Curated annotation (Swiss-Prot):
Function text: Component of the cytochrome c oxidase, the last enzyme in the mitochondrial electron transport chain which drives oxidative phosphorylation. The respiratory chain contains 3 multisubunit complexes succinate dehydrogenase (complex II, CII), ubiquinol-cytochrome c oxidoreductase (cytochrome b-c1 complex, complex III, CIII) and cytochrome c oxidase (complex IV, CIV), that cooperate to transfer electrons derived from NADH and succinate to molecular oxygen, creating an electrochemical gradient over the inner membrane that drives transmembrane transport and the ATP synthase.
Keyword Disulfide bond on entry: no
Family, as annotated: Belongs to the cytochrome c oxidase IV family.
Protein's recorded name: Cytochrome c oxidase subunit 5, mitochondrial
Membrane topology: Single-pass membrane protein
Predominant localisation class: mitochondrion
Region spans: Disordered: 145-171
Transmembrane segments: 101-123
Superkingdom: Eukaryota
Localization in the cell: Mitochondrion inner membrane
The protein's assembly and partners: Component of the cytochrome c oxidase (complex IV, CIV), a multisubunit enzyme composed of 11 subunits. The complex is composed of a catalytic core of 3 subunits Cox1, Cox2 and Cox3, encoded in the mitochondrial DNA, and 8 supernumerary subunits Cox4, Cox5a/Cox5, Cox6, Cox7, Cox8, Cox7a/Cox9, Cox6b/Cox12 and Cox6a/Cox13, which are encoded in the nuclear genome.
GO biological process, one term: mitochondrial electron transport, cytochrome c to oxygen
Amino acid sequence: MLRTPTVSALVRNVAVRAAKPTMAVRAASTMPISNPTLANIEKRWEQMPMQEQAELWMALRDRMKGNWADLTLQEKKAAYYIAFGPHGPRALPPPGEQKKVLAYTVAGVFLSFVIFATMRAFAKPPPATMTKEWQEATNEFLKAQKSDPLTGLTSEGYNGKGHVQSPSASA
């Protein structure tokens, strides 16, 4: 290959053109979507195959990129329904679901009460340290030991209950 200035310039231009990134631009569709396609979309949307749903949504999205005054009433209704309609996660609950939720909640609370009552019925009695007499004796022991003289039982002017928290054993 000859290395002339003309050939070098031609090769340079080809290399520069190849290095420039080109972006594909998709033009918004100017043709309205046919009425039979959009007719009764509220009832047909859930039964449509996913591919057909995606194609219809893309076509509507392309139409919405243009002037909204050019959209037909059917297209506006379909776009609104697809975007905000009661389908998918926004679907209305089936009839009777509230009663079912209430019934299961009541059953769960009742079952937890039965488990609690059963455990209380077969539990051991409270320990001896949970009597009022034992707790008063604990207070006297701590006073004799001069425990916590700054803020506790043996501090000046203390008038709290100390460790007493249970009813008397004779009660």
